[in-house]
């Protein structure tokens, strides 16, 4: 589908008697998996919240102990420039304001100060290891072959992406994050028993 910008909203949904609350946010990005800065955005997203060693996980769950789970994901457009960047947190309803503040603070810090060379190197290494391990799984291979047939692609593109990830610089990762992640454009949904 053609790119359509996310309408920024904040919606609260009451879920009576549920022990946990959930925050889900997201925004569309005018980017495909063929964009020159897609590899850099993969690295940037992983550092922000795409793994258990990410900043969000380390701070919101680890250091502050505010959530049971927290992170981000990147769903890349394969047919057109229409990707999605999302974030989530699972937490006790009474921690709503603290969780929102902590997530916002990590996003602001990443955008303002950027990432370090060490963070970028670690993220690249982890991404490449995960991609290599995934290709050793029969189910991943089968799914990739079906996807490649549909998209008219070959394994050569996967190799190209591996090489592009390996060559991402700290400047490129920071530039991609700042280009695509606009906190004011996020659509945010909060579900939980907040009335208690």
Predicted segments with their positions:
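Generic structural marker for isolated residues within well-ordered, non-membrane alpha-helices
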Residues: 41, 57, 174
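His/Glu-based metal-binding/catalytic segments typifying zinc-dependent metallopeptidases
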Residues: 1-53
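Generic recognition of flexible, low-complexity loop/linker segments
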Residues: 11-12, 73-75, 162, 174-178
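M16 family metallopeptidases and their MPP-like homologs
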Residues: 20-32, 57-167, 183-192
């Amino acid at each position: 589908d053609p790119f359509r910008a996310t309408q920024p909203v904040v919606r609260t949904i009451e879920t009576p008697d549920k022990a946990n609350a959930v925050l889900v946010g997201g925004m569309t990005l005018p980017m495909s998996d063929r964009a020159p800065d897609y590899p850099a955005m993969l690295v940037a997203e992983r550092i922000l919240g795409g793994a258990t060693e990410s900043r969000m996980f380390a701070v919101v769950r680890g250091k502050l102990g505010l959530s049971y789970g927290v992170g981000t994901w990147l769903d890349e457009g394969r047919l057109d420039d229409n990707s999605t960047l999302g974030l989530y947190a699972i937490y006790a309803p009474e921690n709503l304001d603290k969780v929102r503040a902590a997530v916002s603070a990590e996003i602001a810090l990443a955008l303002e100060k950027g990432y370090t060379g060490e963070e970028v190197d670690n993220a690249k290494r982890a991404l490449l290891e995960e991609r290599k391990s995934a290709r050793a799984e029969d189910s991943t291979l089968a799914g990739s072959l079906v996807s490649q047939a549909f998209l008219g692609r070959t394994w050569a593109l996967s190799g190209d992406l591996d090489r592009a990830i390996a060559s991402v610089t700290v400047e490129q990762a920071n530039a991609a994050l700042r280009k695509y992640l606009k906190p004011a454009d996020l659509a945010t949904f909060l579900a939980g028993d907040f009335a208690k």
